[in-house]
Amino acid sequence: MSGSDTSGSVHVDEHGHGKASSSYDGAGAPAPAPAPFQGHRKAGSGSSDVPFLLRSGGSGGDGLRRCLGLIDFVLRVAAFGPTLAAAISIGTSDERLSVFTNYFQFRARFDDFPAFEFFIVANAIAAGYMVLSLPFSAATIMSSKATGVKLLLLICDTIMVGLLTAAASAAAAMVYVAHEGNLRANWVPICLQFHGFCQRTSGAVIASFLAVFVLMVLIVMAAFTMPRRTHHTAS
């Protein structure tokens, strides 16, 4: 009887030990990694997919300033063409007109008009300035906080607007006289005879005024993107 009790207790102990070990094994199994950590990693890695021009960098307006800086760069490249074309068009506008024989010739030359000479110089300076300003414009794209560079470009753009406006206005007055003449001064219009000269000078004036318009747009954009200082009043 006692032997059967002992074996029965051992049997119970074996089952109890088996249950204890199984519960211990289940409790000791390592827990899986939490799912929110993976989602946080994906959300953090998604910031690198944002385009460079739209990254805020801690300030809400930096992305907009970079986009305007890219537009500034493109407009400077676009303004280089009209200024260079205007200078070349006036410089190559000379025309000869033969009357009856080759011994009687009339010439229309740009250097006979001081306004056209000033026009060529001003547009050549503006074309060179557009090329030299491209690295500074690229610097404003890379760093939206380049306040000194933006201020320098704003001042130089304003000077170029004044220079080109004066040159284009003076040349436009000469082109008008060439087309219409002046009856009070007994100046006859010459465009009826010198068609090529008048076409080139008229096109050059239009191109120069187009460059003036582009520069004015650049000035407005620079004033808009210029950072403003905020004054905090002590309470």
Swiss-Prot record:
Residues 89-115, 172-203 are extracellular. Residues 1-46 are annotated as: Disordered. GO terms for biological process: cell wall organization. It comes from the Eukaryota. GO terms for cellular component: plasma membrane. Residues 1-67, 137-150, 225-235 are cytoplasmic. Disulfide bonds: none annotated. It is a multi-pass membrane protein. Keywords: Cell membrane, Cell wall biogenesis/degradation, Membrane, Transmembrane, Transmembrane helix. It is found in: Cell membrane. The chain crosses the membrane at residues 68-88, 116-136, 151-171, 204-224. Regulates membrane-cell wall junctions and localized cell wall deposition. Required for establishment of the Casparian strip membrane domain (CSD) and the subsequent formation of Casparian strips, a cell wall modification of the root endodermis that determines an apoplastic barrier between the intraorganismal apoplasm and the extraorganismal apoplasm and prevents lateral diffusion. Belongs to the Casparian strip membrane proteins (CASP) family. Homodimer and heterodimers. This is Casparian strip membrane protein 2. It comes from Oryza sativa subsp. indica.
